[in-house]
């Protein structure tokens, strides 16, 4: 048992668990999955110094498996005394057609979770400004981001917490590599342009497959997205398919890729802004010939 697992076990509340987990069958498989996700979530929170005691986090809840999982895991860590922050669940209802407005309020109220449901019809703005053949993601995300920043300020939150996972980060990395000509992924911790809000991604180490299994076991009332993920021809879909193929051919490569993003060597890349190649010259001191092999 590693340190993270030991802490999670030791800090289990004597009263049992958060109400979210009380009706979930505690099978051996589920307990292992839950502990693994808790460990990876807490590890990301610690690795990237997300916690400042007394902070108030706004947890964005879309109704998808990832955001449900994020909220449940953060509530679980808080219940165990391992996350000393306030949590506010926020859903931005963007006016998408056939969006079931009752599901999230009913779910959050049933389990006594502090929340806010905000209605802003950004869907009509997107569809009015863009032709049907266009991809809505960019404009939709800009409108959503502006509203989330506003809500966070109104609610006195210090951070916006998002449910992006390992695969989201890797897909973004390859999109930037293949289409943007740069090495960049999703940051696990980001300061907004105004400098007053942090953005956190505590699921940075968590696998999408695990989050899907977790959501199924928890029986979250999933709300499907009628926009972003269902539009054909997205670059992200191509990256997702590529990663699935790589993992199928060479199991474990996704974990290796994530580790690579934590182990960057600027001297072995070509970016002169990150490494002083001009100042590097033979002076009798030992260097590194790793790049030869």
Curated annotation (Swiss-Prot):
Q: Which reaction does it catalyse?
A: cytidine(32) in tRNA + S-sulfanyl-L-cysteinyl-[cysteine desulfurase] + AH2 + ATP = 2-thiocytidine(32) in tRNA + L-cysteinyl-[cysteine desulfurase] + A + AMP + diphosphate + H(+)
Q: Which GO terms describe its biological process?
A: tRNA thio-modification
Please tell me where this protein is predominantly located.
cytoplasm
> Required co-factor?
Mg(2+); [4Fe-4S] cluster
CDD domains tied to this protein:
TtcA-like
Which Pfam families does the annotation name?
A: ATP_bind_3
**What keywords would UniProt list here?**
4Fe-4S, ATP-binding, Cytoplasm, Iron, Iron-sulfur, Magnesium, Metal-binding, Nucleotide-binding, RNA-binding, Transferase, tRNA processing, tRNA-binding
Residues spanned by motif PP-loop motif? 62-67
Enzyme class, one word?
transferase
Free-text remark on how the cofactor is bound: Binds 1 [4Fe-4S] cluster per subunit. The cluster is chelated by three Cys residues, the fourth Fe has a free coordination site that may bind a sulfur atom transferred from the persulfide of IscS.
The record's section on SUPFAM superfamilies has: Adenine nucleotide alpha hydrolases-like
**What extra comment accompanies this record?**
The thiolation reaction likely consists of two steps: a first activation step by ATP to form an adenylated intermediate of the target base of tRNA, and a second nucleophilic substitution step of the sulfur (S) atom supplied by the hydrosulfide attached to the Fe-S cluster.
Q: How does it assemble?
A: Homodimer.
Family annotation (HAMAP family): TtcA
Instruction: Sum up the protein's function in the record's words.
Output: Catalyzes the ATP-dependent 2-thiolation of cytidine in position 32 of tRNA, to form 2-thiocytidine (s(2)C32). The sulfur atoms are provided by the cysteine/cysteine desulfurase (IscS) system.
Q: What NCBIfam families does the database record attribute to this sequence?
A: PRK10696.1
Q: What is this protein called?
A: tRNA-cytidine(32) 2-sulfurtransferase
Q: Which organism is it from?
A: Brucella canis (strain ATCC 23365 / NCTC 10854 / RM-666)
């Amino acid at each position: 048992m590693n340190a993270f697992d030991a802490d999670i076990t030791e800090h289990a509340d004597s009263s049992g668990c958060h109400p979210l987990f009380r009706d979930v069958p505690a099978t051996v498989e589920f307990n292992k999955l839950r502990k693994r996700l808790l460990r990876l979530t807490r590890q990301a929170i610690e690795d990237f110094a997300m916690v400042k005691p007394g902070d108030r986090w706004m947890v964005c809840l879309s109704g998808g498996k990832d955001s449900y999982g994020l909220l449940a895991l953060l509530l679980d860590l808080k219940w165990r005394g391992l996350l000393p922050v306030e949590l506010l669940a926020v859903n931005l209802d963007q006016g998408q057609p056939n969006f079931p407005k009752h599901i999230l309020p009913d779910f959050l109220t049933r389990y006594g979770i502090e929340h806010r449901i905000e209605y802003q019809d950004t869907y009509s703005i997107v569809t009015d400004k863009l032709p049907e053949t266009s991809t809505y993601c960019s404009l939709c995300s800009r409108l959503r981001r502006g509203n989330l920043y506003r809500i966070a300020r109104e609610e006195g939150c210090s951070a916006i917490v998002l449910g992006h996972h390992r695969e989201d980060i890797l897909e973004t990395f390859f999109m930037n590599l293949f289409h943007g000509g740069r090495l960049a992924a999703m940051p696990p911790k980001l300061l907004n342009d105004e400098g007053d809000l942090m953005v956190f991604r505590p699921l940075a180490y968590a696998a999408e497959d695990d989050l899907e299994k977790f959501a199924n076991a928890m029986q979250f009332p999933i709300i499907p997205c009628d926009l972003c993920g269902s539009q054909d021809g997205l670059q992200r879909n191509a990256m997702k398919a590529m990663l699935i193929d790589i993992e199928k051919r060479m199991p474990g490569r996704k974990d290796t890729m994530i580790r690579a993003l934590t182990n960057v060597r600027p001297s072995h890349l070509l970016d002169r802004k990150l490494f002083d190649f001009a100042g590097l010259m033979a002076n009798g001191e030992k260097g590194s010939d790793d790049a030869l092999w």
